[in-house]
Amino acid sequence: MNKFSLLVLIGFLFAGCKTAVLTEVPLSTLNMDNQAKTAILNIEVPGCSSYEDSRQESKALIDLKLKIPQVFNGAQFKECYKVKMDSVASFVIPVYFGKNVLETEIQGAELKIGKDQNNNLLVTATRGLRDKIENFQKQSISKFDFFVMFKIINDTGAEVKNLIAESAFIDDAPTYYIDFNMPKDSSVVIRLNDVATNILTQKGDNNGVALILRLPKN
């Protein structure tokens, strides 16, 4: 599987540790055939190595290597490394996107990104994934928060006008129903609000579908 171009940042606070999944995908790829790509899930851990024996993996890392594949189908451990003073456990998880991905039944697909018939850019999470996230949260010692961010990249070769973001954070600034344009080769980061995030991460009586933004009508 290859990396995809609409950046998806899915983050957790796992037992108080910051976690993020990052993948980039240009707008042009939303019109491609349905396909699976990989997102990078990075989780902050107390340390990669055991304090007693640096040749051994830490208990926190061992625990994550067991639990993350139980939450995300197809998740694979990649590496554990240090960034300045922080230790990060990195995984890859599959995400599916494409021009017909939302209405197509794909075996094993838990996370999807695509456009509906009204050109709304949506992200969906299956009931099975939401159940696993909620169960994982209940098993965690401290609060388990989930946030989702998207880096939209305009690689269409022209300015894209009249995109609409509803009640979201744009480049980390809170906004409500903002209409904006994207110059050629520009990018913008959108983070879902709490309500949309809960739709993707809690069982509830919802369909697991959240709006990212409204694209201009063709």
Predicted region positions:
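Sec-dependent signal peptide recognition
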Residues: N2-V8
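C-terminal motif of bacterial Sec signal peptides marking the signal peptidase cleavage site
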Residues: A15-G16
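Mature, soluble, non-transmembrane domains
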Residues: P69-N218
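N-terminal Sec/ER secretory leader and immediately downstream segment
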Residues: A20-L22, P26-S87
